[in-house]
Amino acid sequence: MNRTESKIKFVGLHAHSVAGSIFDAIGFPNAHMDFCYQNGGEALALTDHGNMNGLPYQVLHCKEMLAAGKKFKPIFGCEAYFIPSVDEWREEYTKAMEDKKRSRAAKKDAQSGATIEDEGSSKKTQGILRRRRHLVLVAQNQTGLNNLFKLVSESYKAENFYRYPRIDYKLLKKYSEGIIASSACLGGVYAGNYWENREDGDEAVMNAMRETTKNMIDVFGDRWYAEIQWNNIKEQHELNQYVIRIAKEFGVKLISTADSHYPNPEAWKDRELYKRLGWLGKSKPSYADEGSELPAGVEEIGYE
């Protein structure tokens, strides 16, 4: 493995473990922490999807490391599932259920030749209802940690949960104190602006990102960070350019993350197999255009 030395210490602020990112990441937090320490790291954030189940592992292993004379700081976080407004989503959901009832009636009519169902519109509505974006949240202090606990708990309540635990701007405003937030990955809030507007051109993407940035700064102030990542996905590099532009425009600080899903480079194949078990073959990776065999090397996967 090639290693680049730098005077600036890299601190991973976006990482996943098997403790909280089931069928997405492998390796318990202690394995991630050990690899980080062995490669000169002094701190690591754990940001599993929608939960903080890995926190006890972080705390216990950090105590073991300190007892062995290894100075290391665990950073507590979560990659939350975000939608702008649960209330607005609920209105959309109610409307969709009414449309679904009408659709069933329309299908019966269609069978008799009376009408034709608008299948495209139905699928579009389902897409909106299921849409959610990633948002990385990291505790800055004890107040932030307490607020993270509250946010995670709130996200699992019936009024917020739909397929996944979700939070919105209203909840973030209530519990934002002491929390650092960043825009996450290709599934993140800035990425959502990119995916939804890129066909309409450069300015459409930027305008959507401006709106997101204003809202996030309103919630977090200078604790809002623009996140870029480095992998082999073409769209990631396109997104990075937009993120850099928006950061410069608003004076938002940039952070670079690994978004790691396995504790060491050699574990990439194990993680790929684990993912496939979770999806039961329903989702074909981008590299698997022919057959279902694993790629020869990690570079063929595209990510991480």
Predicted region positions:
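Phosphodiester-processing cores and adjacent nucleic acid-binding clamps
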Residues: M1-E304
